[in-house]
């Protein structure tokens, strides 16, 4: 049986991959990574360090479009509820990749015990494909406990830069459209050019009129009813201090969402 691990570029999926490689061997394991064309440059260093540690080659896929290009082609402003980038740049090509492989296959995803609510959908979707089962190596005994960076650091692999800056993920150079207000504040503080590029794109989409005029990447839920909160209007909210530093990892669902 062949084992396929989808790597997100984060530490949790790296620990999951290591467990699969240890249990089944590199000769029976394929590691797959989808590049969104928006990644932080240090993510590539992290992947290269993992390849050197495991002595394997990671299969890399790149559509060529950025998440914002995917969203613009779909005539939407992406947010936590609607993010076609995840499906178009990661899920769909991964499905095509595993569909053409000889079966049986076990697909391994890097979700841990804190994310059990996220396991149901990808397990059901991938197991629709004949000959495929889904497993979650971080749930094997002993159950992997976050922060997973402690494990990758024990291999001599440096933690990705975004975690060190306090981001809870290593997605899209800190620009994940599913992230919350604090992460956008953090991006504005640590990578102002990246923040402005997204904020300017969002404003341009809203100015096109139609349904997009009333949507935004972020929502203001301060008064209980969610309303659009354009990034250009985002400031550090009164009484809320932005804290930089390390963070728990991989708390934003991206790859496995449908």
Segments and roles (model prediction):
Residues 1-258:
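Nucleotide-activated chemistry modules centered on ATP-dependent adenylation/adenylyltransferase
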């Amino acid at each position: 049986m062949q084992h396929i691990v989808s790597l997100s570029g984060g530490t949790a999926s790296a620990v999951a991959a290591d467990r699969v490689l240890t249990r089944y061997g590199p000769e029976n394991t394929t590691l797959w990574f989808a590049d969104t064309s928006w990644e932080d440059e240090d993510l590539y260093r992290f992947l290269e360090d993992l390849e050197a540690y495991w002595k394997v080659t990671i299969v890399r896929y790149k559509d060529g479009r950025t998440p914002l290009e995917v969203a613009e082609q779909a005539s939407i402003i992406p947010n936590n509820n609607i993010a076609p980038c995840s499906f178009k740049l990661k899920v769909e090509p991964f499905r095509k990749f595993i569909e053409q492989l000889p079966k049986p296959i076990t697909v391994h995803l890097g979700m841990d015990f804190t994310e059990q609510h996220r396991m149901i959908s990808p397990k059901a979707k991938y197991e629709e494909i004949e000959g495929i089962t889904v497993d979650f190596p971080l749930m094997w005994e002993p159950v992997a406990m976050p922060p997973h960076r402690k494990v990758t650091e024990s291999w001599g692999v440096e933690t990705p830069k975004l975690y060190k800056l306090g981001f809870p993920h290593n997605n899209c150079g800190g620009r994940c459209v599913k992230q919350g207000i604090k992460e956008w504040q953090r991006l504005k503080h640590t990578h102002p050019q990246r923040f402005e590029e997204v904020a300017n794109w969002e404003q341009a989409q809203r100015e096109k009129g139609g349904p997009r005029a009333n949507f935004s990447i972020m929502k203001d839920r301060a008064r209980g009813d969610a309303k659009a909160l354009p990034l250009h209007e985002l400031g550090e909210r009164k009484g809320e201090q932005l804290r930089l530093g390390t963070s728990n990892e991989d708390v934003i669902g991206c790859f496995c969402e449908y």
